[in-house]
Structure formats: C-alpha cells, structure tokens
Amino acid sequence: MVQRWLYSTNAKDIAVLYFMLAIFSGMAGTAMSLIIRLELAAPGSQYLHGNSQLFNVLVVGHAVLMIFFLVMPALIGGFGNYLLPLMIGATDTAFPRINNIAFWVLPMGLVCLVTSTLVESGAGTGWTVYPPLSSIQAHSGPSVDLAIFALHLTSISSLLGAINFIVTTLNMRTNGMTMHKLPLFVWSIFITAFLLLLSLPVLSAGITMLLLDRNFNTSFFEVSGGGDPILYEHLFWFFGHPEVYILIIPGFGIISHVVSTYSKKPVFGEISMVYAMASIGLLGFLVWSHHMYIVGLDADTRAYFTSATMIIAIPTGIKIFSWLATIHGGSIRLATPMLYAIAFLFLFTMGGLTGVALANASLDVAFHDTYYVVGHFHYVLSMGAIFSLFAGYYYWSPQILGLNYNEKLAQIQFWLIFIGANVIFFPMHFLGINGMPRRIPDYPDAFAGWNYVASIGSFIATLSLFLFIYILYDQLVNGLNNKVNNKSVIYNKAPDFVESNTIFNLNTVKSSSIEFLLTSPPAVHSFNTPAVQS
C-alpha cells in the first residue's frame, strides 16, 4: 500500500494524490480567508488584537495556498494527469517517474509555507513579496526565505509537470488522433503547460535574486547599493500575469466539455476555441505592467499596456460567445455541472468587465490596491477557476470513481457557494470605488456596512465547503446506491454517459471524448491495446 502511493508512477494514482493535497490545502486556505473576513467584519480590532503583521501573514497564506496548492494541483495535476492520457489514448504520461517527483516536492513546499508562518512573526509581505518590505531590513529572520523556498518548490513541481504534459501530448497520441482532433481539455492543459514553461523561470530568477539580496549582501533590489525594487516588480509580474491564465485556461477546457455534454451539441467553433486559448496565452505575456501603472512608467508605456490589456478581451469574448452559441438551441439539462458552467459564464464575464475598468492606466491610479481589485480577481478566480473545478469534479467524478454523488445535495451546494461568493465579492467593488485599501486590517466606520455583508457571505461559502466534504464522503460510502434521474444505475458507466459528447462525435471528424467509453472506474492501465481514432 505504501509503495503504491509513495513510489507511484501511475498517472491516475498521482492525480488522486494531487486531489488529496488540493482538498487539504483548500480547507486551510478557506480557514485563513474566514479569519481575514472575521477581522474585517467590523471597524477596529476584532480578533487579531491589532496585530497587522499577523493579518498580512494570513493574506500571504491564503493566497499561496489557494493558488499554488489548490487550483494548480487540482486543475493541472489532478484533472490533467487523470484525463489527458485517457483522452489521447495513451497508456500513461511520457515520464511517469518525473510525474511522481513533480507531486512529491509539493508537500515539501507546503511544509516550507506553513513553517514560514510559524517562525519569527511570519512573512507579512502579500503574495507578491515586494522588496523593500520583503528585504532583510523589514523582515529579518527566516520567514520570507522559507516562503521563497515554498515558491521554488512549487515552481519545480509545475515545470516538471509542464514538460511531462507537453511531451505526452506531442508524442503519445493514439493512431489517427491529429492535433486538430484533440479534445479541448487536452488543448487547455497543453497551452497551460507552455505558459508554465515560459513564465516560471522568470519568477524563480526574481525570488532567487531576492534571496541573495536578503542573505548574501547583493543589491539587485537594494537602492542603497544601486539596485531597483521596480526590477523585481517587472520580473514578478512577467510571471504573475501569465499565472492568472494558467489558473483559468484549464477551467476553460472543462467548461467546454460540460457545456457541450449538457446541451447535447458539439462545441461551437472548436478550432477557434483552441486559437482563442492560444491567443489568450500569448497575449498574457505582453501585458504584465498593467499591475504596476503607478510605479512611474512613461505615458507611452502606459498607453501600450492599456491597449494590449484590452485586446485580451477579444479572444476571451470569442470563447464566451462560442459557449453561449453551444448552449443556444441545445437540449439543455440543468445537472450540477451545467449549473456551475452557466454560473461560470455569467460571473467570469462580470469579472472580465471590472477588469476592463482596471486596464485603463488613468482609472487604475484610483483603483490600484483597493478592494475593487480584490473584487475583480476573486470574481475571475473564485467564480472562474473554482467554479470550473467544481464543474469538472461533478462531471467526471462518477466516471473516475464509479460512484455517483447525491444530485440534490450537489445542487444545494452549488446554490450555497453561488450566493456566498457573490455576497462576499460584489460589495468589495463598492468599497474599492470609495477608496478602501487592501491588506489593511482596520478601516474607517464609513466602510462598515459592506464589510459586514461580505463577512456574512464568507460564512455561507464556508458552509458550502463543509457540504462538499460531506457530498464527497457520501459519494465514497453510498455511491453505488445514489440514484441518477430517480433510477438506480445498473450500467457500468458514468450517469451522463448517455448524453456525453461521444454520442454525436464518434461518426464525425471531430474528436470524441473517449474517457467515457472506458469502464468506470477505468482500469489501472488503460489502452494496453492502442485505440484508433477514426
């Protein structure tokens, strides 16, 4: 048993390990966000006894856990490892042992992150770790160093995984499966892997320079030695902006599959969906300075970054309208994954619209570092990446586990997180427009109302997380008895196999999602005999 999980080279087992780590980290990250919202529920010091450093440590912990230990391990490590080989008809990934080490450096990174919060007074730098706040003068002691090591380890994990996915997709497709026939989820992981490959080395360079500045007396970002902290911001955001697309593009792939299945229609404009994802990925590297309009960039530089940022809205719009066109005229069934997908469309678009306001260099002078920004990126991440994660879970888990979840509870869980997330993040836009700054544990009484509302929302969202854990428990224990469409499931297939994309795709030139044609759960080694793509 120990050997199976510790030394595993099987993509399916490694995917399960990623999911377990993601669930654990997600619960820890949610706990931190709940403490943050409790502290902000009313003006003055509530629970942290005026300890602003601790507040910022919680902000760092929440951000890094949610980004590097929940969304990336679940969407890329979990769904990517499990489904990508199945969808292309491969027996496993190209480098199974690299796959193993890519997972096992993540728990080490988690240990470093947790340790960084427990030594000295923690790393209270924000997840961006900007110098001079993160310099040795402002943060003496090993906290920031440990946080940097945590980022290094997650970077190594993601880089190894990315190399594995790229080689697997290029070299291990089954007979007849050309790149144009790849399912959209495989394309999304493939494009994401390239983004990781190009952006993570830049982050690693930046935080390594910071490590040297802190411990070995270099002056990369030290003004007194001729360095420039703005250089760090450029390096960080050259990674940081592609990173947000790394978080959302696998979600795009999942939503495409879900929308197609529950509308009983092929995705509208499949090839243009691929080109849209690729364009978003490419443009993501050309807009990083929109995060730093207020550091003193030239007017013409600001003009360029404003227009380049707005251009990203075009391929994103193509994707949104293609999904709507897929739904239009379809035979729609509002099962739980479809509810998440439709909510994703509305709320991701909403997050994109607030982003258009932030793209303007002149407007951003007012919005920068206010709760408007927090509201914007949580709409995109909390209701984009997380909703797509839930959609993917409810869509594929019956096929992966061979066990059904309780549909009624799953829909209740959807409505709880839908209401909770909106109640948290919608009021933040009002707070930001009125000038409430981020990362500050106290605020004037004028901001009390909407903060109280947001804190109530965080309780609703946390309740939905507890319900999800129960749904997962119920699925594992009673999965064979749970009914689909009020009928006991007697066939050995996922409940929505009957309306899966395989039906209308098998006889066409488009790729069929072959993961639903396998047994449920799939065998330990699928495709010992290569499948042939028609």
UniProtKB/Swiss-Prot annotation:
CDD domains: Cyt_c_Oxidase_I (cd01663). Ca(2+) binds at residues 39, 42, 44, 441. It is a multi-pass membrane protein. Heme a3 binds at residue 376. There is a cross-link at residues 241-245 (1'-histidyl-3'-tyrosine (His-Tyr)). Pathway: Energy metabolism; oxidative phosphorylation. Binds 2 heme A groups non-covalently per subunit. It catalyses: 4 Fe(II)-[cytochrome c] + O2 + 8 H(+)(in) = 4 Fe(III)-[cytochrome c] + 2 H2O + 4 H(+)(out). Keywords: Copper, Electron transport, Heme, Iron, Membrane, Metal-binding, Mitochondrion, Mitochondrion inner membrane, Respiratory chain, Translocase, Transmembrane, Transmembrane helix, Transport. O2 binds at residue 245. It is an enzyme of class 7 (translocase). It is found in: Mitochondrion inner membrane. Fe(II)-heme a binds at residues 62, 378. Residues 40-54, 119-142, 216-228, 296-298, 359-370, 432-449 are mitochondrial intermembrane. Its cofactor is heme; Cu cation. The keyword Transcription regulation does not apply. Mg(2+) binds at residues 368-369. The keyword Electron transport applies. Component of the cytochrome c oxidase, the last enzyme in the mitochondrial electron transport chain which drives oxidative phosphorylation. The respiratory chain contains 3 multisubunit complexes succinate dehydrogenase (complex II, CII), ubiquinol-cytochrome c oxidoreductase (cytochrome b-c1 complex, complex III, CIII) and cytochrome c oxidase (complex IV, CIV), that cooperate to transfer electrons derived from NADH and succinate to molecular oxygen, creating an electrochemical gradient over the inner membrane that drives transmembrane transport and the ATP synthase. PANTHER family: CYTOCHROME C OXIDASE SUBUNIT 1. This is Cytochrome c oxidase subunit 1. The lineage of its organism: Eukaryota, Fungi, Dikarya, Ascomycota, Saccharomycotina.
